[in-house]
Regions:
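N-terminal capping segment at the start of a domain
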Residues: 2-38, 127, 383-385
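Active-site-adjacent substrate-binding region
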Residues: 9, 23-24, 162-212, 250-255, ...
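Zn-dependent metallopeptidase/amidohydrolase metal-coordination segment
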Residues: 15-21, 84-85, 281, 352-402
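A non-catalytic alpha/beta surface segment that caps or lines the substrate-entry region
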Residues: 27-72
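A short beta-alpha structural unit
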Residues: 33-37, 267-275, 286-293, 318-337
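Alpha-helical metal-binding/catalytic segments enriched in His/Glu/Asp
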Residues: 83-85, 92-130, 218-224, 230-256, ...
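Midchain, well-structured core segments that form catalytic/ion-binding scaffolds
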Residues: 128-129, 133-295
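His/Asp/Glu-rich mid-to-C-terminal helical/loop segments that flank catalytic regions of hydrolases
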Residues: 214, 230, 234-259, 306, ...
Length: 417
């Protein structure tokens, strides 16, 4: 279906304005940060709910704090094709990661009448994808997929509030969480539009990309422990400097990642006791490790563990590790991926660019309960998780039309009713 350009332009203007509006809802006055089960979470979802209703959807908040909108299909109660993304952010975030996908989904839903499709159409604004507050990602989508881990209830935020307590403070009942779970027979599939968060579409001079798979990721909390001492009085041959050991390990992360074709990042590091004239006795730091294939990711980790053992042997240190997150790689469903590809082709791009997603997405969790596929949208210089995150309205327009066409491609294979 070819859309009137003026109509699409007006829809895109509205999407961009709404991204700006959501970006004003932040827990910090100087930058964008919006986390799970916070007042800002509620305020953002109240806005999203109004926009869903304006697009003709019935709405509710599920038992995990996700906001859901639904348009019925040819008859009430049909299985639903889910469209969605997330509304939470990292600290000092951009305004398009997650939010653009939610707003595109709402706009697409607004292009359909109740009863028009052979399935219901639902838009889900996931409450927690980033894991910023409690350190574990994909909580919103894991709840919907029925893969919730009850050990999470004991997780705490920076203020010592447990996830269990935060649920209650938000007005949710932890005992009712299973009410968010979906069954496979209730769903047709899941489609997500998202900024690429990488430079590959820009390098290829393409607006849109076809996601083939989502990287498998593991995250670790790591510790090197040595012995603190006087910076002036302790000779080098007697030092057990935890920071020097950790620094050597960080360099090894870069080297091993390049060697294996994985992506390893140390994004957080704390030094103790932290005195300017004290040899560091302990270093606590993070490791984010991801790859297109789990076997490659795991081989990289095995190599890094061996590196850590060698560092400890040479420097008189001990190494501690705790895995805090694991998500295996997920392949996009061939049928739904072809629907996305046909949507891209409908915009004039006859040979869609296939890309594997280096970033994690809610689809990783949703794949446990229903097939998934994703559409990538070019972002300026591949920048994401940063205030400079940027998209072009023309690319958003192409994404909107392609996403609608993908829904219609799925519908074309099913009878109405």
């Amino acid at each position: 279906m070819r859309r009137d350009r003026d109509v699409t332009a007006a829809e895109v203007d509205l999407i961009m304005t709404r991204c700006d509006e959501l970006a004003t809802i932040s827990s910090h006055p100087d930058y964008l940060e919006r986390v799970h089960l916070s007042p800002e979470h509620r305020a953002a979802h109240d806005l999203v709910e109004g926009w869903m209703q304006g697009a003709g959807m019935s709405t509710w908040m599920d038992a995990a704090g996700n906001r859901v909108g639904r348009i019925e299909g040819g008859s009430p109660g049909l299985p639903a094709l889910l469209l969605g993304s997330h509304t939470d952010t990292v600290p000092d975030a951009g305004r398009y990661d997650g939010m653009l996908g939610v707003l595109l989904a709402i706009a697409v839903a607004g292009r359909f009448r109740p009863g028009e499709l052979p399935f219901a159409l639902e838009v889900v604004a996931f409450s927690d994808e980033e894991g910023t507050r409690f350190g574990t990602a994909l909580m919103g989508s894991r709840a919907l997929a029925g893969t919730w881990d009850d050990d999470w209830w004991r997780l705490t935020d920076a203020d010592g509030i447990t996830l269990f307590e935060a649920f209650q403070d938000f007005g949710l009942d932890p005992a009712r969480l299973p009410g968010a779970f979906r069954r496979p027979e209730q769903l047709v599939g899941y489609l997500e539009a998202h900024i690429e968060q990488g430079p590959y579409l820009q390098d290829a001079d393409r607006r849109l990309g076809l996601v083939t798979s989502i990287a498998g990721a593991r995250r670790f909390a790591l510790t090197f422990t040595g012995h603190a001492g006087h910076a002036g009085g302790t000779p080098f041959d007697r030092r057990r400097d935890a920071l020097v050991g950790a620094s050597e390990f960080v360099i090894a992360v870069e080297a091993a990642s390049k060697n294996h074709g994985t992506i390893g990042t140390v994004g957080k590091l704390e030094v103790f006791p932290g005195g300017v004239n004290v040899i560091p006795g302990r270093v606590e730091f993070s490791l984010d490790l991801r790859a297109e294939h789990d076997v490659i990711r795991d081989a990289t980790w095995a190599e890094l563990e061996a590196v850590a053992v060698d560092i400890c042997r040479r420097r008189g240190l001990t190494f501690g590790t705790r895995e805090i997150y694991r998500a295996d790689a997920v392949a996009c469903d061939p049928f739904l991926a072809e629907a996305i590809a046909s949507g891209i082709r409908s915009t004039g791009d006859v040979d869609p660019v296939p890309l594997w997603s280096r970033a994690g997405h809610d689809g990783m969790a949703i794949a446990a309960v229903t097939p998934i596929a994703m559409l990538f949208i070019r972002c300026l210089d591949g920048i994401s998780h940063h205030p400079d995150e940027s998209v072009q309205p023309a690319d958003v327009a192409a994404a909107l039309d392609a996403f609608e066409a993908a829904v219609r491609a799925v519908a074309a294979t099913l009878p109405v009713g």
